[in-house]
């Protein structure tokens, strides 16, 4: 699951077709949970610098169920899409934060996406 999410978010950042995976079709559906107009506000609330990727912990939004997990993934993907490609982005920090927030619900997410763990 971690590898899939990393590849998906990086793909959303640069659109590199070598990252594409058919599972992305399921993940991109999460975009409906986050309005495009809210992305600028979310970026502002994350107080990001030019070298930051999505810093979800700065939003102070709880993750209490699989729907919250989907929303966090959608926020990460949309922010990654909108910040543009830069070599200095510290993706490791962003992914560490994301996984720390959602790992408790990985099994639920797998069940939701694929009908199994």
Swiss-Prot record:
Q: Name one GO biological process term.
A: symbiont-mediated perturbation of host apoptosis
InterPro entries documented for this protein: Orthopox_N1 (IPR009353), Poxvirus_Bcl-2-like (IPR022819), Poxvirus_sf (IPR043018)
A Pfam family (short name) is: Poxv_Bcl-2-like
Q: Does the keyword Membrane apply?
A: no
Q: Could you tell me what induces this protein?
A: Expressed in the early phase of the viral replicative cycle.
Keyword list (alphabetical) reads:
Early protein, Host-virus interaction, Inhibition of host NF-kappa-B by virus, Modulation of host cell apoptosis by virus, Viral immunoevasion
Q: What does this protein do?
A: Bcl-2-like protein which contributes to virulence by preventing host NF-kappa-B activation in response to pro-inflammatory stimuli such as TNF-alpha or IL1B.
Protein's UniProt name:
Protein OPG035
Q: Which organism is it from?
A: Monkeypox virus
């Amino acid at each position: 699951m971690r590898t899939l999410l990393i590849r998906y978010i990086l793909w959303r950042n640069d659109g590199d077709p070598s990252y594409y995976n058919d599972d992305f079709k399921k993940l991109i559906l999460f975009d409906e949970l986050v309005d495009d107009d809210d992305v600028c506000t979310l970026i502002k609330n994350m107080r990001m610098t030019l070298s930051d990727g999505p810093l979800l912990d700065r939003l102070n939004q709880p993750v209490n169920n699989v729907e919250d997990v989907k929303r966090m993934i959608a926020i990460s993907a949309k922010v990654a899409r909108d910040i543009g490609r830069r070599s200095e982005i510290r993706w490791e920090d962003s992914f560490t934060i994301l996984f720390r927030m959602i790992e408790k619900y990985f099994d639920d997410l797998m069940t939701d996406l694929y009908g199994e763990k």
